[in-house]
């Protein structure tokens, strides 16, 4: 591990001891949120992103180390592992370089070169490589026998052997790699006969496309690759000047100008076209795809984080509406804990159009269930339903919110929803999800596959394993940042708490159901399979409101309770008094409580937490209203200034909900009156923005927006 620690430290420009300590904690079973929050002294205050990067790099080095062992074992079994070769493999920590070293020894399917060797042509190839003279015809005749029919057959076989040697030459591969890295151009052409396909229309921009690979943005590259996968586009990656590639190879392998050197020259050109170029093109295609995947996953994870940390309404009685025309609007009433109290359908819109009756029912439900806020899904009939709701006269002031439905239909048909509401249909479950999403977006969204939430960029085209890891890590980070009420949380939410997972999460809910609410964090140790390690990892992130010890409802870890108790004792007060009295807290000198294991970073966190125990880091929710005059894309006119909500962020800009079916696009160049390279520095998911319409394409259902000058 020491060697890996040093390599990671060098790559990330971090002191090696911080990397070593982080790796020890990770290998000891500590989670990233726990290390980031409660082990700052060990890591020097590394954040979750840095800890995750250390973990990722360690896993890659471990994988590479195993690959090296496999390669050495294979070469040794061939009897070709020299001391020099072993040293080269041991000292290699670059995956591409390692495979280049291995290539000459790698078991191959039967190649043209191997077939030529079996015909006894290897000595001819070796003689040609000497490039000493012109007595070619006489020498070649010696090899015309057996399966070799004539001189040309012999020369062709010898050239095949030379071509393979050129292909397996490390320096040659690096030369071509260098040319690709400097000059690679990605080109796309429409497949002949596909121009008029309906599916091809969205790839029209790439029918005759060419761009330097290093300048090709991730969203363009993923779009091109999707077009290729669908059989619409033919894609290639080549250096802009291929002559320079062959010239470099000729300078390396061809000497003089005689009959032999001309044969070598021909073999070198064949090696480039048939072997080297396709291999390096495949390599660069994979590398560029991996880079595009990483960028798309980064954007998706960032969007998901903002969505999960959206402002919650909190524990209030909510009426949720899943709007619709023909099937009506499904209405549910929820108590402050999100429990379903009532459901029914109303029909305020055509074709039934029971407007007055629907209004009376709605007013009665608001009064009967003492509703404090109404959540309306943003799908079909959303604007009409919002207008219907806001036109009613309630007996109290009711806040009305439009809530994203993305993923609600998937949740309503899921096993999770069926287990939760076995006696209700999908429409009721969907309306409940909409209402709960207003109360606590994080608690509700964790029940839905993150890929279904609709804030990704080509999420189905990227590496699915890496995507799942990134999204799971994002959910885990958000859940632990906010903290979880152990007495109300679902098993889905508890699953993402540091140190728990599905089994312990279910055990906690089962214990709670059987024994009533938890009264202290220590009681968690009575949960089946809750060991000391799991308790250490989860305790600080679980909250117990109204606990006897107020610290149980804070982010102060139980291991630090003695420190807080000592602070209170030194001030001759109780822990409750210390939390309630700012003047008492101001008299604390954190330096006084520093020990070998607890430093100022932890003490600073403790004092901040005592100011507002269990505080929610999410912002306060705000009511938003769309322009009442805009109901469809036909109402949108160039020059209009409209309110909107950012719903998705990509590399090329962001999409904005204007309260109609079609989302508007603010291109990255229109986000601000300055150059913007990263849209996330200007906008965030759910941000309320004011935009101006700069283009409407009703045929293609596209709306172009700007924030410049707004």
PLM features: what roles do these ranges have?
Residues 15-16, 28-29, 121, 227-231, ...:
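Short flexible coil/turn linkers enriched for glycine and charged/polar residues
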Residues 50-53, 60, 64-320, 326-412, ...:
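Duplex nucleic acid-engaging cores and interfaces of nucleic-acid transaction enzymes
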Residues 544-710:
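Single-stranded RNA-binding regions, centering on S1/OB-family and related RNA-binding modules
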Residues 4, 56, 63-80, 90, ...:
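Long, highly charged, low-complexity intrinsically disordered interaction regions
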Residues 318-320, 330, 386-389, 520-523, ...:
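Short beta-alpha junctions and helix-cap segments that line functional grooves
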Residues 74, 88, 98-102, 227-240, ...:
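Structured, non-catalytic alpha/beta "coupling" segments that mediate domain-domain communication
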Residues 38-40, 129, 240, 323, ...:
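Short, ordered loop/turn segments at secondary-structure junctions
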Residues 178-185, 321-325, 379-384, 403-410, ...:
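A glycine-rich phosphate-binding loop feature that marks nucleotide/adenosyl-phosphate handling sites
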């Amino acid at each position: 591990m020491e060697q890996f620690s040093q390599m990671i430290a060098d790559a990330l420009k971090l002191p090696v001891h911080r990397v070593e300590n982080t790796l020890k904690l990770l290998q000891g079973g500590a989670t990233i949120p726990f290390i980031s929050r409660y082990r700052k002294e060990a890591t020097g205050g590394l954040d979750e992103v840095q800890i995750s990067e250390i973990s990722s790099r360690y896993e890659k080095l471990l994988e590479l180390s195993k690959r090296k062992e496999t390669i050495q074992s294979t070469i040794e079994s061939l009897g070709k592992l020299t001391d020099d070769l072993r040293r080269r493999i041991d000292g290699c920590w670059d995956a591409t370089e390692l495979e280049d070293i291995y290539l000459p020894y790698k078991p191959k399917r039967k190649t043209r070169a191997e077939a030529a060797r079996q015909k006894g042509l290897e000595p001819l190839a070796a003689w040609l490589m000497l490039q000493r003279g012109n007595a070619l015809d006489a020498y070649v005749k010696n090899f015309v026998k057996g399966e070799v029919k004539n001189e040309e057959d012999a020369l062709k076989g010898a050239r095949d052997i030379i071509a393979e040697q050129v292909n397996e030459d490390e320096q040659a591969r690096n030369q071509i790699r260098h040319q690709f890295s400097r000059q690679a151009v990605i080109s796309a052409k429409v497949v002949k006969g596909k121009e008029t396909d309906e599916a091809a229309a969205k790839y029209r921009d790439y029918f005759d496309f060419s761009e330097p690979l290093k300048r090709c943005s991730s969203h363009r590259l993923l779009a091109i690759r999707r077009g290729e996968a669908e059989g619409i586009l033919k894609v290639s990656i080549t250096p802009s000047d291929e002559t320079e590639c062959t010239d470099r190879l000729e300078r390396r392998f061809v000497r003089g100008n005689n009959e032999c050197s001309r044969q070598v020259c021909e073999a070198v050109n064949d090696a480039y076209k048939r072997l080297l170029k396709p291999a390096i093109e495949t390599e660069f295609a994979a590398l560029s795809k991996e880079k595009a995947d990483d960028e798309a996953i980064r954007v998706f994870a960032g969007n998901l984080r903002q969505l999960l940390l959206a402002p919650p309404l909190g524990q209030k009685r909510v009426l949720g509406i899943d709007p619709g025309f023909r099937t009506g609007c499904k209405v549910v009433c929820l108590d402050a804990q999100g429990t379903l109290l009532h459901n029914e359908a109303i029909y305020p819109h055509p074709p039934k159009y029971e407007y007055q009756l629907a209004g009376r029912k709605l007013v009665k439900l608001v009064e009967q269930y003492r509703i404090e806020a109404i959540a309306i899904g943003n799908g079909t009939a959303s604007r009409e339903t919002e207008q219907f709701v806001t036109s009613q006269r309630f007996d109290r002031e009711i806040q009305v919110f439009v809530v994203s439905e993305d993923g609600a239909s998937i949740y309503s048909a899921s096993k999770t929803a069926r287990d939760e509401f076995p006696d209700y249909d999908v429409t009721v479950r969907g309306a409940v999800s909409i209402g709960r999403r207003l109360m606590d977006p994080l608690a509700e969204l964790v029940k839905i596959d993150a890929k279904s939430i609709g804030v990704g960029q080509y999420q189905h085209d990227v590496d699915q394993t890496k995507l799942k890891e990134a999204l799971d890590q994002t959910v885990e980070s958000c859940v632990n940042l906010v903290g979880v009420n152990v007495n109300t949380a679902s098993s889905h939410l508890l699953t993402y708490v540091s140190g728990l997972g599905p089994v312990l999460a279910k055990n906690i809910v089962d214990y709670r159901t059987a024994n009533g609410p938890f009264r202290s964090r220590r009681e968690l140790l009575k949960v089946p399979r809750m060991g000391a390690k799991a308790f250490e990892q989860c305790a600080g992130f679980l909250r117990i409101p109204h606990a006897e010890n107020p610290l149980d409802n804070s982010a102060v870890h139980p291991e630090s309770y003695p420190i807080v108790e000592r602070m209170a004792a030194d001030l001759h007060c109780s822990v409750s008094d210390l939390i309630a009295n700012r003047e008492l807290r101001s008299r604390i000198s954190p330096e006084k409580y520093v020990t070998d294991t607890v430093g100022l970073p932890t003490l600073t966190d403790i004092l901040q937490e005592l100011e507002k125990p269990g505080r929610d880091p999410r912002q306060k929710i705000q009511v938003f209203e769309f322009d009442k005059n805009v109901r469809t894309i036909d109402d949108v006119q160039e020059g209009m200034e409209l309110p909107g909500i950012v719903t998705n962020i990509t590399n090329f800009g962001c999409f904005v909900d204007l309260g109609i079916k079609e989302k508007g696009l603010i291109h990255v160049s229109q986000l601000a009156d300055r150059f913007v390279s990263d849209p996330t520095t200007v906008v965030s998911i759910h941000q309320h923005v004011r935009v101006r319409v700069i283009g409407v394409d009703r045929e293609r259902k596209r709306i172009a927006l700007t924030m410049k000058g707004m």
